Curated annotation (Swiss-Prot):
Monomer. Keywords: Porphyrin biosynthesis, Transferase. It comes from Stenotrophomonas maltophilia (strain K279a). Binds 1 dipyrromethane group covalently. It catalyses: 4 porphobilinogen + H2O = hydroxymethylbilane + 4 NH4(+). This is Porphobilinogen deaminase. CDD domains: PBP2_EcHMBS_like (cd13646). It comes from the Bacteria. The porphobilinogen subunits are added to the dipyrromethane group. SUPFAM superfamilies: Periplasmic binding protein-like II (SSF53850), Porphobilinogen deaminase (hydroxymethylbilane synthase), C-terminal domain (SSF54782). Its EC number is 2.5.1.61.
Length: 303
């Protein structure tokens, strides 16, 4: 019996996503044996500093990629928003699964919305993108760092450390915690991270057998959207060190891409949007990036 080993982080959300991919693989290939290889990454272990301070979201990938290179796993499953814009050889993304809700969720035990927060309320997030948009919308708030997995963050809220926190809707709903969302933060006022809500499979792009195994899991509509968002981010040289947000949505047969570059320190933000053919998401992403740069985003990117 053929076996596929999936490298995954150990967090509940990462395990859920990897098991979801495993289930889809078993459905697509009856008789295939799929097993998870849970691993801890530096991004999971260092929780007292922001991701930007310790090397960025790529920390979530490196150990999993090393496991593949050592032959301990055949593939890895990631939240696509954590995947760098450029993969190191020989890696590729053979499958981007159907995207979940890409929105951010406002979570609070006391207040029904972002607007309802009192002046000086404490909001937890370590995401520079979320901080930038919070400062733009509510410059009076006190923004506090918040790291850890979803359950850890919720526990910190419940223990009184924050008046509200912001988490991805997809992560909460995948873990059966959707009832904790009191409001969705959505376009056009609020934009998610590029590729937020999408799960991707990574493997050796030169391994034709693996590439073919994962091909049935790929969702073309999702891939078009997230490739436009990631192309914009790539053209801006964005990373978790810079507040960049993007969302592409289908508009008939075309894609509508909205992008934002912000400042986590003072709430300044530059926005741009464009519509383009779905068969050229790269071009659309580059066009919106140019619009952002033409409108002054470069100044924020170089802060």
């Amino acid at each position: 019996m053929e076996t596929v080993r999936i490298a995954t982080r150990k967090s509940p959300l990462a395990l859920w996503q990897s098991e979801h991919v495993a289930d889809r693989l078993r459905q697509a290939h009856p008789g295939l044996h799929v097993e998870l290889v849970p691993m801890s990454t530096r991004g999971d272990e260092v929780l007292d500093r922001s991701l930007a301070a310790i090397g960025g979201k790529g920390l979530f990938l490196k150990e999993l990629e090393l496991a593949m290179l050592r032959g301990e796993a055949d593939c890895a499953v990631h939240s696509l928003k954590d995947v760098p814009m450029e993969l190191d050889p020989p890696f590729a993304l053979p499958a981007m699964l159907t995207r979940h809700d890409p929105a951010d969720g406002f979570v609070s035990n006391l207040y029904a919305s972002l607007d309802a927060l009192p002046i000086g309320a404490r909001v937890g997030t370590s995401s520079l993108r979320r901080q930038a948009q919070l400062r733009a919308l509510r410059p009076d708030l006190e923004l506090l760092d918040l790291r850890g997995n979803v359950n850890t963050r919720l526990a910190k809220l419940d223990n009184g450390g924050y008046d509200a926190i912001v988490l991805a809707v997809a992560g909460l709903e995948r873990l059966g915690l959707g009832e904790r969302i009191v409001a969705r933060l959505q376009p056009p006022q609020w934009l998610p991270a590029p590729a937020q809500g999408a799960v991707a499979v990574e493997c050796d792009g030169g391994n034709a057998r693996l590439m073919a195994l994962f091909a049935p899991l790929d969702d073309a509509a999702t891939r078009a959207c997230v490739e436009a968002e990631r192309a914009m981010n790539r053209a801006l040289h964005g990373s978790c060190h810079v507040p960049v947000a993007a969302i592409a949505q289908w508009q008939g047969d075309d894609l509508h891409l909205q992008g934002l570059v912000g400042s986590a320190s003072d709430g300044r933000a530059v926005r741009a949007e464009a519509v383009g053919p779905a068969n050229d998401p790269e071009g659309l992403g580059q066009r919106v990036a140019k619009l952002l740069l033409d409108d002054g985003a470069g100044e924020l990117l170089n802060v």
